[in-house]
C-alpha cells in the first residue's frame, strides 16, 4: 500500500499565514508541522512509500520528507497549481499510484490511533465521516445510502449527510476507477473542481 498526500494548494483561505509556507508546514503545539506529523504517523503505521503532490514551496516539503529515511517519498509537481484544483494533481500522480492507496489531504491533523485502525480494517475501501458533528459550512460533507458513500461535496445538506474527513483507504481497483473518472474531467478541461467531483 502507498500513501498519497495532496499538498499542491495555495492555502489562500489562511491569508498571510501561508504566504511563506504551505498549509502542511503550519506548526502544531510543540513545533511539529502537519506534514512532519503525517509522515511520522504513516511510517509508524508501516507505510513505506509516499507520494506527495506539490505546488509552491516544493523545497520545504522535500526537506521535511528527507527527515524520514525509512520512507520512499516521491514528489509530484503540479506546474498549474495556481489555476487548478487537486483533481489535476491527482491526475499527474497517476503513474505512481499502482497499488492499494491511503489518500489524505495535507492539512489534516488526526489521532495517532487512526491510521493503524484504518489499515487493520478488513474492508478494502474506507472513508471517514462523523455522524455526531454538525455539518460544517465550508468544508466537506458526504452523503451515504445503504452504508455506501454516494457523494462528497462542500455543498451538501439534508438527510443522510454527515461531516466528512478526506482520508480514504482504497483498493487498487477502486483507485484506478476513480482515476479513470478524473482523467475524463481533465480531458474536458474541468480541472478547477475537487477530485471528489469525479467520484
Region roles according to the model:
Residues 1-61:
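N-terminal glycine-rich phosphate-binding loop and ensuing alpha1 helix
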Residues 187-199:
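Catalytic core and acceptor-binding pocket of nucleotide-sugar-dependent glycosyltransferases
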Residues 111-189:
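Conserved core of the sugar-phosphate nucleotidyltransferase
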